[in-house]
Amino acid sequence: MKLEGRRIKGLYLVTEDYSRKNFFNIIEEAIIGGVDIVQYRDKSNPRSVRLDVARKVKQICNRYDILFFIDDDVQLAIEVQADGVHIGKDDMPLPDARRIFDGLIGYSTYGDREMAIFAEKNGADYVAFGPFFHTDTKKDADVYDIHVLEGIHKYIRIPVFVIGGINISNIRTFSGYGIDGVAVVSAIFSDPDPERAARELKAALYNYVLSSA
């Protein structure tokens, strides 16, 4: 996939850890439903399993010509030739990741605008703020004040995503903040119909959030 000119925006699916038989089916159905980007996130499996799963998820993403990211593991992203990697403050330092990885880099900025400014200056291609709601994916995570998003593009030019507990019921909360996309986990992975869930989220995102940017 050629990355030049690719706008990082839209509906961003972050996976659960690989554990269930229908893991790959969920991802493919979600893509059919409208997911624009997939990030493989797995905190529990050994590296050998993660390598195999990453390759399979990448094949699915390539089939539909959508961006494929790896969470945290820059070396794994290099090995499977992922389009991008997403890191945070507890992972490889951003300047180091930028030196060794030629693809796209996303950076978690939590509720910290200064961290977003740092990320842009050090080569990040997008930032992710949140969570702004309680989330089952990270039960102990702090919940941040949504007002950190106000006028965010006065401070940075790279795309801004939001993540954490976002679902069809609260996605409109982000209308008017100028964000570029939302990232979800449970809103798709916990839904019995991932394709429908993705389609509804995509419609709400484009009709009420991105249209108000």
Swiss-Prot record:
Entry keyword annotation includes Metal-binding: yes
The protein's required cofactors: Mg(2+)
Pathway assignment: Cofactor biosynthesis; thiamine diphosphate biosynthesis; thiamine phosphate from 4-amino-2-methyl-5-diphosphomethylpyrimidine and 4-methyl-5-(2-phosphoethyl)-thiazole: step 1/1
A Pfam family assignment: TMP-TENI
Entry's cofactor comment: Binds 1 Mg(2+) ion per subunit.
GO MF term list: magnesium ion binding; thiamine-phosphate diphosphorylase activity
Enzyme Commission no: 2.5.1.3
Gene3D superfamilies named among the record's database cross-references: Aldolase class I
General function of this protein: Condenses 4-methyl-5-(beta-hydroxyethyl)thiazole monophosphate (THZ-P) and 2-methyl-4-amino-5-hydroxymethyl pyrimidine pyrophosphate (HMP-PP) to form thiamine monophosphate (TMP).
Family listed: Belongs to the thiamine-phosphate synthase family.
Designated name of the protein: Thiamine-phosphate synthase
Species per Swiss-Prot/TrEMBL record: Thermoplasma acidophilum (strain ATCC 25905 / DSM 1728 / JCM 9062 / NBRC 15155 / AMRC-C165)
